[in-house]
């Protein structure tokens, strides 16, 4: 189990005996997803998308040539700056402004897993896990976004949670804050859901993932055995 930094601290790799998770900071401010899958020894940029000039794209105006944000693998995407996918994070400020672009500020490693106040959670000994804390900020909106990634010594999972801090002078309304957003290679995947009713819970169904949005939810005000 390890959390290692490469390329002068611009790439971070979380690994154990089973899996690896890799992120990179581009242009010193954009946090992008690079890899999640079977364990790799060292990330060397294999599998990164190749960028080229295309029509109808909003181009990035900095040092990364031909990058367009609508196909950029953001680790935690937001809207309003050329990324037209569903955002993982969205706010409305007191003055009605909805634009928010938290950019990378720092990351650090802590032993164990941070405790979540008032929330159900996994409990683990401190020497059995490590956590990467990533801090992103939007100075204009006064928003600080904390992203947490916990990797375990003996389990092939990465545990994630987020925290938002308002250090500005305005009231901020959270419109959307997702548990995660994950970029995966273009392959054939299946979606597995568990549907049911009273005394017939957790019936498995699987089907291929297709283009478009798929949503599973329920309309009750508590944990339910049904989904819609």
What are these language model-derived features?
Residues 12, 19-25, 145-151:
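Broad, structure-driven detector of short, well-ordered beta-strand segments within folded domains
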Residues 15, 28-29, 35-39, 50, ...:
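Acidic (Asp/Glu-rich), glycine- and aromatic
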Residues 36-60:
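Acidic, aromatic-enriched beta-alpha/helix-loop junctions
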Residues 1-9:
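Short, Gly/Pro- and small/polar-rich lid/capping loops
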Residues 64-70, 187-216:
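Beta-strand/loop-rich accessory regions of lumenal/periplasmic or secreted enzymes
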Residues 217-227:
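Conserved small/polar residues in nucleotide/adenosyl-binding loops
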Residues 78-155:
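Extended, loop-rich substrate-binding clefts of extracytoplasmic carbohydrate-active enzymes
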